[in-house]
Amino acid sequence: MRAHYSYLKGDNVAVAQCPASCGELIQGWILGSEKLVSCPVDWYSTVAVTAAPPLINERPLSRAMVERVLAHWQYPAHWSNEIRVDVRSSIPVAKGMASSTADIAATAVATAHHLGHSLDETTLAQLCVSIEPTDSTVFHQLTLFDHNNAATQIACEPPPPIDLLVLESPVTLRTQDYHRLPRQQKLIASSATLQQAWNLVQEACITQNPLRLGEAATLSAIASQTLLPKPGFTALLSLVEECDLYGLNVAHSGSVVGLMLDRKRHDIARLKGKLAEKKLTRHWPKQHLLKMVTGGVKLQ
């Protein structure tokens, strides 16, 4: 799901794309603080940056990122008045799919390119967390990431191939509202489980074992039920067993759920039928079949 631009070659435009995430593979108290590993999927925010006055209806966080990038290279702040940011994205907003991270990360890379610079992933992550908690979709590899301050960035080996049937709920939750919840005590209580999940993520990537990745994600999803419970969760776990799926993952600060599978091996039509039969579609009326992809922002 990519947004396409019709700019002619030679136009003075910088275009960058960043993927969405189907929630997180894992999120919780790991190595002394709350951290996450995002689950990048093939649904993208595309951002074009040109030399022109700003659009009236620009996204405020993308404009804030332009200002951060200018400040990073010590350019005059008023240059922002001659930089236009055009965001094209159909990623669902406020549901745990990293729509905001995709927007601001792509904006940062496109703006940097427009100014004649490039951004390494560490600097990009630091710029993003200076605006809001950030998903690890900004990294090419699956990465354990401290999404609040970017202090921890531990990359994994390439993961095994995974598809996800993403269950989209009409329920929205802003990331900043999740972060206002009193949650540290519950996070710490699940720290042993999350350490196990993190170990399984690393093992899954080293051994190319999708079942291990599903096991890791399911452990984290179960732990998340004490913080932000998903409706029909027990029925979803039963469905994973019944259809012999790899596991499930959730948005720990949102409402989406991902059923982890192989579209060549698992019967998607049967799975969707089971969702309806178990009345789970009342909670997740929309489903999207996506694949997990490499993360990172790419210039077009």
Swiss-Prot record:
Pathway: Cofactor biosynthesis; adenosylcobalamin biosynthesis; Polyol metabolism; 1,2-propanediol degradation. One of its GO terms (molecular function) is kinase activity. The keyword ATP-binding applies. Disruption phenotype: Growth is impaired on 1,2-PD minimal medium supplemented with cobyric acid, but is restored on similar medium supplemented with vitamin B12, cobinamide. A double pduW-pduX deletion grows as well as wild-type on 1,2-PD. ATP binds at residues 92-102. Changing residue 101 to A: Does not affect catalytic activity. Its EC number is 2.7.1.177. Gene3D superfamilies: 3.30.230.10. Its main location: cytoplasm. It catalyses: L-threonine + ATP = O-phospho-L-threonine + ADP + H(+). It is found in: Cytoplasm. Changing residue 100 to A: Abolished catalytic activity. L-threonine kinase that catalyzes the conversion of L-threonine to L-threonine-O-3-phosphate. Involved in the de novo synthesis of adenosylcobalamin (coenzyme B12) and the assimilation of cobyric acid. Uses ATP; the activity with CTP, GTP or UTP is 6, 11, and 3% of the activity with ATP, respectively. The 1,2-propanediol (1,2-PD)-specific bacterial microcompartment (BMC) concentrates low levels of 1,2-PD catabolic enzymes, concentrates volatile reaction intermediates thus enhancing pathway flux and keeps the level of toxic, mutagenic propionaldehyde low. This gene probably benefits from its induction via the Pdu promoter, rather than a physical interaction with the BMC. Catalysis proceeds by a steady-state ordered bi-bi complex mechanism in which ATP is the first substrate to bind. Belongs to the GHMP kinase family. PduX subfamily. PANTHER family: 4-DIPHOSPHOCYTIDYL-2-C-METHYL-D-ERYTHRITOL KINASE, CHLOROPLASTIC, L-THREONINE KINASE. This is L-threonine kinase. The lineage of its organism: Bacteria, Pseudomonadati, Pseudomonadota, Gammaproteobacteria, Enterobacterales. The gene is pduX.
